[in-house]
Amino acid sequence: CSSDLKEDKLMHSNLIKDWRNGMQHNIPVNANFTLFNYLNVTPSFNFTDRMYSNKVTRSWDEERQVEVSDTTYGFHNVYNWNLSLSASTKLYGMYTGSPRLFKKHPWQIRHVFTPQVSFSYAPNFGSARYGYYDTYQKTDANGNVSLVEYSPYSNSLYGVPGKGRTGSISWDVSNNVEMKIKTDKDSTGFKKISIIDELGASMSYNMAAATHRWSDLSMRLRLKWWKNYTFNMNAVFATYAYELDENGHPYVGNHTEWGKGRFGRFQGMSQNFAFTLNP
């Protein structure tokens, strides 16, 4: 009986009015190329498009004190997009030392410096120009008036893009320092010694934030002085300095630590040893 009922509804239903339907497609565009022979550039662009056959407009019935919905049918296109761009390169420094320090074996120190900058952006799809969000005025039984925000596409199959503009610029630097000593004991003729496997730092700037746009400074250190052991350490330094309010109570203000001639406020650190078993 249940199966026959579903089949009967299916055969006599209206595809647009009786079914929750929609179509969505995603278009990612990515590339990777080298600029000026040294700069690695990676741009990307993502576009998401949703197509709906209806939208729901809401209003407030003051007499009945209920929300009223009105569904209108037609073609509605709801899209959003975002883009990003990253660029990185590697800079090498070499230092050749005196062989007298290592029993007349030639040795060399190599420093690899890897800076990277990234940019990402997405517009505010909650803006009135897109029409993805709307408002109506609500007056309750006590005469209190409020503005209710909603999206005509919130119950649609693929939803609606989020509100708010996003945009950030991120920086990251990484350092690697290793030594090579000429030796007859290695088949390559050289023995590599890791001095600093990685010493790095990262930070970002939120262009869409109203205040405190700079993130905290994160630093990391990795050492591999022994074959199977790795030492990791991470530390965080706060960007914004403490200030005092009118009552003398401290709070995080809008002035940076480096603006006051300081490196940053130490927030904490973590460290660990890792041991790797070779088969």
Task: Report each predicted region and the residues it spans.
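Outer-membrane beta-barrel translocator/pore domains, especially the C-terminal barrels
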Residues: 3-279
